[in-house]
Amino acid sequence: MVLSFTRQRCLFFFIAPVLLVALSSCGSSSEDEASPGSVITDTDGDGEEVSESETTDQESSETGVTEPEITDPEVAGPDGDEQGDTDGTNPLDQPNILLVITDDQGIDASAQYSLSNDLPNTPVINSLARNGITYENVWGTPSCSTTRAALLTGMHGVNTGVLSVPGNLPTDSTTIQAFLSQNAASSNYQTAVFGKWHVDGGGGNLNHPNDFGVGHYAGHLRPNITDYFDWTITINGVEERNTTYHTTALVDNAIDWIDEQQSPWFAWLAFAAPHAPFHAPPDEFNTRGLSGTQADINANEREYFLSAIETLDTELGRLLNSMDPATRDNTIVMVIGDNGTPRDVLDNDSFLDGHQKGSLFEGGVRVPLVISGAGVTRTNVRENGLVSVVDFFPTIAALTSGTDNEGMHDGINFLSSFSADGEIDREFLYTDYDGNNALGQGWAVRSTTHKYIAYDNGTEVLYHLVTDPDETVDVSTTNSAIVSELRDFGLEVRGE
């Protein structure tokens, strides 16, 4: 694989808050087995094939999404000579990295997946997807803290101890920010986190992000804000009241910090949106005409939920437009969601009741991811290879220092997928959660076709995700070999 970071260097990953590649579509009705790296050709379940070049455009027309109003929408692969090693782990240039995380936005609430007829209008993220890659099979964890800890460390919950909410990152953990500063090849990187942190156990240490290697922190340390218009911001250990709309304030802080940088940087932008409390956004973002009364919110919660996603999409566009051309051309943006959609706002036409945030079902762990920009030579395509949130640590390490530091994390570097089809070296995905007895604590493993769940009460189930995307029929008794294979992988991850 060859990467180039010459002229157009903006790379975007969509993980449910701002630019990230959209997640796996196990809910597809296609009954054909899709191998890792293959392009999904039936995106809407109507049985008609869609070519790589048609997929995202078709989705945009179906959902009524308009083009983003950004200064330079061309965020596809760079022009100019190709650079870097053929294995994709040693780019000659050091790109800036913007990782955007949305809070509680599952794939049923992501326009890039078309699992629902009730979707947000996200032209900025849609543009990134058209000029990059939408990932179909990405696993986070069932909750906020557990996914964030996995992203930060590249380790699964069983190996960090962060298995529930609120998570408390062990003091000996090495975060990706700490790795960048400690590694000689990437020690010139400046790092910042804006927004939700949620891995300090609620202990009240105002310097917690900085203690874990974050150079600059501006956000909310308390797990969830109670008012998007009146909240407490912590800036490098100092608290103060903030009455600027939360989504806007985070982008304001990110813009100011990025504008000051003279060295390559890694910025982590973790929106609270669209997490509750649901509310009407400021008038300039309120395109749905929401009244904001409690009665209206109670009656139309998903409308308010989707409005928050649309607002963060607009503000993401403002952030991108704020960058001078040289900075933007050398910036990789990743956008991803942290977990599935909560029950109160879940589209039950996409996932069954109970298959939401907090569960080990696909509706709880599959997240959206979009990648676009520098070094991404595949554009307007859907990648079916398996990706885990623990894979971001080695991938970012490879982008910034030329090494994925194999051995210090549970992840796999998926940088090669940016320019080559079918090169994600992952056979299985793993996730775990101990935070919700009602929905079932335990751990899960999936392959390209099957999913195994081991609940803490000793129950084991197996689902065929191709023929049973709703995960309703347990086929464990007739597929003992597959059960053993997936169970063994999970036990290996767990050190059992």
What name fits each language-model region?
Residues 2, 27-29:
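N-terminal acidic, proline/glycine-rich, low-complexity intrinsically disordered segments
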Residues 4, 17, 84-95:
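Extreme N-terminus of proteins, especially the signal/transit-peptide cleavage junction
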